């Protein structure tokens, strides 16, 4: 009865085989490394369902049989074992028999199956097995030397537990009978090696011997895919006789044996009837599926008695136990570093050799371990299979999830022995220790700056190369480091998981929270050794030190302006690009800096966190508070050299000085008007856009400037703090008072160059000039009608929108403009403010007074 053949594809693909000559050249350390690598490969394959049976070679290695056994022919037996392509049962029996010694018999005279034949070969432990007087040909069959018939080896079991190789064609049994006492026969050697002249019993021995005559060049046959180091012409076709390489035409993979290739080919067509219902992965055996399912169910049958941790495989438990015992049996001969697992040693050795066998087929990046490659590939696919059940955040690697979970639990298992500070990961601890030692072994070859680790150096080097591999999917902005992208993405999704327990303020990064807490504690741990100034952040100290050295390493490639910090350069670049990535969710206004957005939001919320200790007045920014404090001290240290006017800060002096130079760098893109200060342009642009961000909570009226809103609020309160010294008239705004004062002085400094008309206020002159030019810059986007004033456009727009914000308190009638409401109210109040001087009659509107004038003209005529 034939046994069902089992597909044993993957272990042969990864198994490393040596010739007798090669093996004897290896030292004991290399042989131990061979054992560890073979066991690791098999373990990895078994875990993912790639290996369906355990080869006897692995069983021997797991039992730690002395590797001298392999010297005595095990590797050659393994090679021949692969060539016969036996099933799992046959392989185990074959290896068991071969380890005890075997007698090979052959019978062509009709002997009974199971009877040892007289003509045969007996093998001891140091010999190689022979086959049925056969020579290997290019196919999967073997030819009998006596009758020339082809056969395929097929193993059967007998009641005497003897192994019979049945020849399918010539039906002659080969009987393997354990017989350690017999000695190896020495049949006539009729096959000669063409390279060295040595003779052998058959072609198989010659082939095994020929592998020692390796040469550099490999000659590949295009017809069959084979390749050889020493080709021999046979019928116009290259027949390899030494070390051979067989190529798979589907995936172009090379193999050293035809059996390897045949087994590998089944991986392209092999039937896998056992499907995983979770992920769809298929397996050839049920046992492999069961092992795989543990990855989904997280079934962990092997428990550690020390800590209760469970594992899927017993080998993993064994490795874990060493973390309790401290045992590290695998030591590196190069540097003496010891490891708890052979796989760790194997990976570590690659740091000495530089070997990175696992290469990404997308970007070409190579890794020392397959697990690293798997995690890297997820950066291309975006796959994040490990999800946090607390906050829903997903990760590409299990280790990242483990470290992340410690943020929720507060667990910090890695304490520093120097300062007792603890960390969530060993990598963080390693980096922290260098802050005590000051060790920075990695130096930049361009600017000589040093770093604590190679990854920081690699990230830094991108500043010089300009490479920014991490791109934001929302806005396309690119970053040199992944951490920069991670922080940036939080701007788009608004996520702020780190909250201050003191004031409730939330931050997108843990470092942001740590820096914020120092505001409450007043801690400033970073001190300048030059002047003794203390700062709350290390980055602030770095920037501060450059004020002493004068270093400004960050240069704008547009205007050559230099900056002490990269963040300043990044913000400056937005003046060239016009980029404003920070948008207010209340009014849609955008800003080039996050700090500007933060200040702007306070205009909506009314928050004024910076309070003056002198008068209690609050401000939305620290800069405003600093300027205000100088009003109490009357300090104005910055003086203009032209007119000796003094200012509280250098920026105000710089803006003022443009009055003397005539420089107006801020130009309106709508009408071309230029301004000496950016704030002037910002306010002016609102005339074109109609934007009024500052709304009165009492009546809903909106204003383009905060000062306009403040003045308006005083109209509700009746507050008019600015009083005229000449007539006692009071005003809600200082600007209104300044315009009024010119009535008393008769000053009209703003003159029209066309007609000579003068005006008390500068804003009146450009409006007047439009009467000469005919310019009407404020256009309705709906009907195209243009206006001289933005206020006219605003009132006009209400015709299209139907908005009537001014409502009569008596009858409820609504109007589009305030003047319309005032006229209407006079009907209810009876007020008639317009008097005709000729007859003394009063009217409710100026239009009525003008109409009344017409009859008097007739009387005068």
Swiss-Prot record:
InterPro entries for the chain: KRAB, KRAB_dom_sf, Znf_C2H2_sf, Znf_C2H2_type
Keywords: DNA-binding, Metal-binding, Nucleus, Repeat, Zinc, Zinc-finger
Predominant subcellular localization, coarse grouping: nucleus
The keyword rRNA-binding belongs to this UniProt entry's keyword annotation: no
GO CC annotations on file: nucleus
Protein location: Nucleus
SUPFAM superfamilies xrefs: beta-beta-alpha zinc fingers (SSF57667), KRAB domain (Kruppel-associated box) (SSF109640)
Zinc fingers classed as C2H2-type: ranges: 191-213, 246-268, 274-296, 302-324, 330-352, 358-380, 386-408, 414-436, 442-464, 470-492, 498-520, 526-548, 554-576, 582-604, 610-632, 638-660, 666-688, 694-716, 722-744, 750-772, 778-800, 806-828, 834-856
Function: May be involved in transcriptional regulation.
Protein name listed in UniProt: Zinc finger protein 26
Organism field: Mus musculus (Mouse)
Gene name for this UniProt entry: Zfp26
């Amino acid at each position: 009865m034939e046994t069902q053949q089992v597909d044993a594809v993957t272990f042969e693909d990864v198994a490393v085989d040596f010739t007798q000559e090669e093996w004897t050249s290896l030292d004991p350390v290399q042989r131990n490394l061979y054992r560890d690598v073979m066991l690791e490969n098999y373990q990895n394959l078994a875990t993912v369902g790639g290996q369906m049976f355990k080869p006897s070679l692995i069983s021997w290695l797991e039992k730690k049989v002395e590797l001298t056994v392999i010297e005595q022919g095990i590797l050659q037996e393994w090679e021949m074992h692969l060539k016969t392509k036996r099933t799992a049962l046959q392989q185990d029996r074959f290896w068991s028999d071969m380890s005890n010694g075997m007698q090979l018999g052959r019978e062509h005279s009709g002997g009974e199956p199971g009877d040892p034949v007289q003509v045969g070969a007996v093998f001891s432990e140091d010999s190689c097995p022979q086959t049925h007087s056969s020579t290997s040909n290019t196919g999967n069959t073997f030819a009998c030397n006596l009758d020339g018939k082809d056969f395929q080896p097929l193993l059967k079991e007998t009641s005497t537990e003897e192994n019979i190789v049945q020849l399918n064609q010539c039906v002659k049994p080969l009987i393997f009978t354990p017989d350690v006492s017999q000695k190896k026969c020495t049949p006539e050697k009729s096959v000669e090696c063409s390279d060295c002249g040595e003779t052998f019993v058959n072609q198989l021995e010659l082939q095994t011997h020929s592998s020692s005559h390796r040469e550099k060049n490999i000659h590949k046959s295009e017809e069959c895919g084979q390749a050889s180091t020493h080709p021999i012409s046979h019928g116009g076709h290259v027949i390899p006789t030494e070390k051979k390489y067989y190529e798979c035409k589907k995936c172009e993979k090379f193999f050293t044996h035809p059996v390897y290739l045949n087994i590998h080919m089944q991986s392209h067509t092999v039937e896998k009837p056992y499907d995983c219902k979770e992920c769809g992965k298929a397996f050839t055996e049920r046992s492999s599926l069961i092992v795989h399912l543990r990855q989904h169910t997280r079934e962990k049958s092997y428990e550690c008695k020390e800590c209760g941790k469970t594992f899927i495989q017993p080998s993993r438990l064994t490795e874990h136990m060493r973390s309790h015992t401290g045992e590290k049996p695998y030591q590196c001969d190069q540097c003496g570093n010891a490891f708890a697992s052979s796989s760790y040693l194997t990976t570590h050795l690659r740091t000495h050799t530089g070997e990175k066998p696992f290469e990404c087929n997308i970007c070409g990046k190579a890794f020392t371990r397959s697990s690293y490659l798997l995690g890297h590939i997820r950066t291309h696919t975006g796959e994040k299979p490990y999800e946090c059940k607390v906050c829903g955040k997903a990760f590409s690697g299990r280790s990242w999830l483990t470290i992340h979970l410690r943020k929720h639990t507060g667990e910090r298992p890695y304490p520093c022995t120097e300062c007792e500070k603890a960390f969530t990961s060993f990598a963080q601890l390693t980096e922290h220790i260098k802050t005590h030692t000051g060790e920075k072994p990695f130096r930049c070859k361009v600017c000589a700056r040093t770093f604590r680790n190679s990854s920081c150096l690699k990230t830094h080097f991108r500043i010089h190369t300009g490479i920014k591999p991490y791109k934001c999917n929302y806005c396309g902005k690119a970053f040199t480091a992944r951490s920069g992208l991670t922080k940036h993405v939080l701007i788009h999704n608004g996520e702020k998981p780190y909250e201050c327990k003191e004031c409730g303020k939330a931050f997108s990064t843990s470092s942001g929270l740590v820096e914020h807490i120092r505001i409450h504690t007043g801690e400033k741990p970073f001190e300048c050794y030059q002047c003794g100034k203390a700062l709350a952040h290390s980055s602030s100290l770095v920037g501060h030190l450059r004020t002493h050295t004068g270093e400004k390493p960050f240069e704008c490639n547009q205007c050559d302006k230099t900056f002490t910090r990269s963040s300043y350069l990044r913000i400056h670049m937005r003046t060239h690009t016009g980029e404003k990535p920070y948008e207010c969710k209340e009014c849609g206004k955008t800003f080039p800096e996050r700090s500007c957005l933060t200040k702007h939001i306070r205009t909506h919320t009314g928050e004024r966190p910076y309070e003056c200790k002198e008068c209690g007045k609050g401000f939305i920014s620290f800069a405003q508070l600093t300027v205000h404090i100088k009003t109490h001290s009357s300090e104005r240290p910055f003086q203009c050299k032209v007119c000796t006017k003094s200012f509280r800060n250098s920026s105000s002096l710089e803006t003022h000085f443009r009055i003397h130079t005539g420089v107006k760098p801020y130009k309106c893109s709508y009408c071309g008007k230029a301004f000496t200060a950016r704030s002037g342009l910002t306010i002016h642009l609102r005339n074109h856009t109609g934007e009024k961000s500052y709304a009165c909570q009492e009546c809903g009226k909106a204003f383009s400037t905060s000062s306009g809103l403040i003045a308006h609020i005083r109209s509700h309160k009746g507050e008019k703090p600015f009083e005229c010294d000449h007539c006692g008239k009071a005003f809600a705004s200082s600007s209104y008072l300044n315009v009024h004062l010119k009535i008393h002085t008769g000053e009209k400094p703003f003159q029209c160059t066309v007609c000579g008309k003068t005006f008390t206020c500068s804003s009146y002159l450009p409006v007047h000039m439009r009467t000469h030019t005919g310019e009407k810059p404020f256009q309705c986007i709906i009907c195209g009608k243009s206006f001289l004033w933005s206020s006219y456009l605003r009132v006009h727009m209400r015709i299209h929108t139907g908005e009537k914000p001014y409502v009569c308190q008596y009858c409820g009638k609504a109007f589009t403009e305030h003047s319309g409401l005032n006229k209407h109210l006079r009907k209810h109040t009876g007020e008639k403010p317009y008097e005709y001087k000729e007859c003394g009659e009063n009217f409710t509107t100026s239009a009525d007074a003008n109409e009344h004038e017409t009859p008097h003209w007739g009387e005068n005529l």
